[in-house]
């Protein structure tokens, strides 16, 4: 929670504490906050070790599943669509349609023209009945 607080922010907090609490009560408040954080950390580590003892090897599996959920939670809608529905092909979103898709061998062989072949140099085919 406090992993990204820098020295500048700490200095601002001390200055605000000095103004609000005064120089007499500030050291006691800092000691109280440090001991409260230490107790909370000890309590949480005790709970973790108790769960590890009670659940056993399933605890690591549970942590793995929670890690996967955390990855999904951090995904943007675009990344989720790309990963799960489009099998990682993000050309729909990036507009990079020029790269050829890998060929899959047909059971009957090559019955028709290859869809990835380039159309000859000439006018672009146009269908007036198409919408």
From Swiss-Prot:
Subcellular location: Cell membrane
Biased composition (Basic and acidic residues): 96-106
Claim: Membrane is one of the keywords in the record: yes
Protein topology in the membrane: Single-pass membrane protein
Keywords: Cell membrane, Membrane, Protein transport, Translocation, Transmembrane, Transmembrane helix, Transport
GO CC list: TAT protein transport complex
Subunit structure: The Tat system comprises two distinct complexes: a TatABC complex, containing multiple copies of TatA, TatB and TatC subunits, and a separate TatA complex, containing only TatA subunits. Substrates initially bind to the TatABC complex, which probably triggers association of the separate TatA complex to form the active translocon.
General function of this protein: Part of the twin-arginine translocation (Tat) system that transports large folded proteins containing a characteristic twin-arginine motif in their signal peptide across membranes. Together with TatC, TatB is part of a receptor directly interacting with Tat signal peptides. TatB may form an oligomeric binding site that transiently accommodates folded Tat precursor proteins before their translocation.
Name of this protein: Sec-independent protein translocase protein TatB
Organism per entry: Mycobacterium bovis (strain ATCC BAA-935 / AF2122/97)
Lineage per the UniProt record: Bacteria, Bacillati, Actinomycetota, Actinomycetes, Mycobacteriales
Gene expressing this chain: tatB
């Amino acid at each position: 929670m406090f992993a990204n607080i820098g020295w500048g922010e700490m200095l601002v907090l001390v200055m605000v504490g000095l103004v609000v609490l005064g120089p007499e009560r500030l050291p006691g408040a800092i000691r109280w906050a440090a001991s409260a954080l230490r107790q909370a950390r000890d309590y949480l580590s005790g709970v973790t070790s108790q769960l590890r003892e009670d659940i056993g090897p399933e605890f690591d599996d549970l942590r793995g599943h929670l890690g996967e959920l955390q990855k999904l939670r951090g995904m943007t809608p675009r990344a989720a669509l790309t990963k799960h529905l489009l099998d990682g092909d993000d050309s729909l979103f990036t507009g990079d349609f020029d790269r050829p898709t890998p060929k899959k061998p047909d059971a009957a062989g090559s019955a028709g023209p290859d869809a990835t072949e380039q159309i000859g140099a000439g006018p672009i085919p146009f269908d007036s009945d198409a919408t």
